Amino acid sequence: MDCGLYIITDEILAPGCSHIQIAKESLSGGAKIIQLRDKRRNAAELYAIAQEIRSLCTQHHARFIVNDRLDIALAVQADGVHLGQDDLPLSAARLLAPRPFIIGVSVGTVEEAVLAEKGGADYLGVGPVYPTGTKADAGPAVGPGLIRSIRERVAIPIIAIGGINLTNAGDVLAAGADGIAVISAVICSPDIAAASRKFADLMIHS
């Protein structure tokens, strides 16, 4: 899986900015993966939003991932779904969505990472690397050291997430991350496209 700048949409953190607008501006700034994350909207609303983002990602040759909602991901022919430890079990998701459909899994320990790879995950979301206020149930920060430890044990791509900004992103990549997932450092910026471009440029030169 080709990694790069991975943007997660969140309308709560970016009031007045829709999922579609976040995706559009992030893609114009060089994002390679967009994840739609919304725990509030009903299925019909999410489906309509996901269709729009799917189209945008296709235009920009980027991947589109849906958080948690495998049904929505399959319905709009998204590239994949991202699952947390308390979401639909990886084994069940893989039965419903064989490869090349992408399944990413959030992990916070080496053991979870190894199990996810063995279970058929295509990439790992590792974090929170640094303290973050983006996700209330994110747990304690694990630091770049966990990325190094996981990198030694698994072969699938690692996407680092949690408290990542332009100051610490280089350290995360140096620790072995294949990509970085960014939320507030981009979507809370007054210029989402410009903020995305800075991260994309940093990754190219790291």
Curated annotation (Swiss-Prot):
Q: What is its EC number?
A: 2.5.1.3
A GO BP term, please? thiamine diphosphate biosynthetic process
Q: Which UniProt keywords apply?
A: Magnesium, Metal-binding, Thiamine biosynthesis, Transferase
On the tree of life, the source organism's domain of life is Archaea
Has UniProt tagged this entry with the keyword Magnesium? yes
Provide any one GO MF term from the record. thiamine-phosphate diphosphorylase activity
User: Which residues of the sequence carry a binding annotation for 2-[(2R,5Z)-2-carboxy-4-methylthiazol-5(2H)-ylidene]ethyl phosphate?
Assistant: 132-134, 163, 183-184
Q: How is the cofactor bound?
A: Binds 1 Mg(2+) ion per subunit.
Cofactor(s) the record lists: Mg(2+)
Pathway the protein acts in: Cofactor biosynthesis; thiamine diphosphate biosynthesis; thiamine phosphate from 4-amino-2-methyl-5-diphosphomethylpyrimidine and 4-methyl-5-(2-phosphoethyl)-thiazole: step 1/1
Q: Which Pfam families match?
A: TMP-TENI
Q: Which InterPro entries match?
A: Aldolase_TIM, ThiamineP_synth_sf, ThiamineP_synth_TenI, TMP_synthase
List residues binding Mg(2+).
Answer: 68, 87
Name the reaction it catalyses.
2-[(2R,5Z)-2-carboxy-4-methylthiazol-5(2H)-ylidene]ethyl phosphate + 4-amino-2-methyl-5-(diphosphooxymethyl)pyrimidine + 2 H(+) = thiamine phosphate + CO2 + diphosphate; 2-(2-carboxy-4-methylthiazol-5-yl)ethyl phosphate + 4-amino-2-methyl-5-(diphosphooxymethyl)pyrimidine + 2 H(+) = thiamine phosphate + CO2 + diphosphate; 4-methyl-5-(2-phosphooxyethyl)-thiazole + 4-amino-2-methyl-5-(diphosphooxymethyl)pyrimidine + H(+) = thiamine phosphate + diphosphate
Binding-site residues for 4-amino-2-methyl-5-(diphosphooxymethyl)pyrimidine, renumbered to this chain: 35-39, 67, 106, 135
Q: GO CC annotation: what is one?
A: cytoplasm
Protein function: Condenses 4-methyl-5-(beta-hydroxyethyl)thiazole monophosphate (THZ-P) and 2-methyl-4-amino-5-hydroxymethyl pyrimidine pyrophosphate (HMP-PP) to form thiamine monophosphate (TMP).
Q: Which PANTHER family match?
A: THIAMINE-PHOSPHATE PYROPHOSPHORYLASE, THIAMINE-PHOSPHATE SYNTHASE
Q: Which family does it belong to?
A: Belongs to the thiamine-phosphate synthase family.
Q: Which HAMAP family match?
A: TMP_synthase
Protein name as catalogued:
Thiamine-phosphate synthase
Question: What are the leading ranks of the lineage?
Answer: Archaea, Methanobacteriati, Methanobacteriota, Stenosarchaea group, Methanomicrobia
Name the gene. Answer: thiE
